[in-house]
Amino acid sequence: MPEYKKRELKFIGSALKDLKQFPGKVKREVGFDLDMVQSGETPATAKSLTGLSGVMELVERYNKDTYRAVYVANIGGVVYVLHCFKKKSKQGIKTPKEDIDLIRQRLRQAKEEEKRS
């Protein structure tokens, strides 16, 4: 069986700082899931983010709160973590517009970074 080379993991903007603010159990779960993504697998907690092609989100629930880590894995063989946040909305599952706007901005940054390398 051929050995799969792990993809590099890069955080855009404040994504790493924001992830570090998550509760310990959530950080471990997200870290494990991102390790799976780096290895070419799709975690069970991953789902496609509506309206943004190729952008995925990891959803973790903890103590009645929902934490999300948004990433893209189809840019130059690198896994870019675009945004990590605690969902604040009490109604519905829709991602707030300000978070979507930030994700779009960081996706552009990731694409620009890939062009430079």
Residue map of PLM features:
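Basic, Lys/Arg-enriched alpha-helical interface segments
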Residues: M1-T66, I75-V78, K88-S117
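Conserved catalytic cores of phosphodiester-cleaving nucleases, focusing on short active-site segments
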Residues: Y80-H83
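Hydrophobic/aromatic beta-strand elements that line small-molecule binding cavities or substrate pockets
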Residues: A69-Y71
